[in-house]
Swiss-Prot record:
Protein name, UniProt field: Ribose 1,5-bisphosphate phosphokinase PhnN
Binding-site list for ATP: G10, P11, S12, G13, S14, G15, K16, D17
Gene designation: phnN
NCBIfam families, alphabetized: phosphon_PhnN (TIGR02322), PRK10078.1 (NF007485)
Any one GO molecular function term: ribose 1,5-bisphosphate phosphokinase activity
Organism: Pseudomonas paraeruginosa (strain DSM 24068 / PA7)
One Gene Ontology term from the biological process aspect of the record: organic phosphonate metabolic process
Similarity section: Belongs to the ribose 1,5-bisphosphokinase family.
Length: 185
């Protein structure tokens, strides 16, 4: 049996890291693997469970075919370890923290991937980004405009998951959507 690749994506501030953290235990109990991605920024700086590497280390890993998927966005490099192919072949469902901008390429490599778009209402997203304090109000407005463009441009089937409310509700909705008799159900 082949596992399912669950490709989570959403704008900065949508709560992807919070969702992954909150869903980690219930998904693990169901046999789902949550991938630790490789990123060229300190994991502490992003608040996610990521392996931080330098740009030179990332390039070395990429040349060595250590990634099943890799992309560049916002001045950073992101990689999904090639180990996911082994897990999928063993029948495990695998959840990755992906990129909206890389979805088309991911679908070419994994045509049956399950795309999950985590979103929030624009005003909620604005408030979350302001609370983080990393960007100016003008940069936040530009980010919100890009978010609307990205959402309109995504093609193919995808599950839209609203994280504007309580995180527990979002976790329950994700688990219900992944229902069935698979490893992640």
């Amino acid at each position: 049996m082949t596992g399912r690749l669950i490709y989570l994506m959403g704008p900065s501030g949508s709560g992807k890291d919070s969702l992954l953290q909150a869903a980690r235990e219930p998904l693990a109990l169901r046999g789902c693997r949550i991938v630790r991605r490789v990123i060229t920024r300190s994991a502490e700086a992003v608040g996610e469970d990521a392996q931080a590497v330098t740009p030179a280390q990332f390039d070395t890993l990429e040349r060595a075919s250590a990634f099943a998927m890799s992309w560049r966005a916002n001045g950073l490099c992101y990689g999904i370890p090639v180990q996911i192919d082994e897990w999928l072949a063993q029948g495990y469902d695998v959840l990755v923290n992906g990129s909206r901008g890389y979805l088309a390429q991911a679908r070419r490599r994994y045509p049956d991937l399950l795309a999950v778009l985590l979103g929030v209402q624009p005003e909620v997203l604005r408030q979350r980004l302001l609370a983080r304090g990393r960007e100016s109000p003008e940069e936040i407005e530009a980010r919100l405009a890009r978010n609307a463009e990205f959402a309109a441009g995504l093609e193919g089937p995808l599950f839209q998951l609203d994280n504007s409310g309580e995180l527990d509700d979002t976790v329950r909705a994700l688990l219900a959507w992944l229902g069935g008799d698979r490893a992640c159900a």
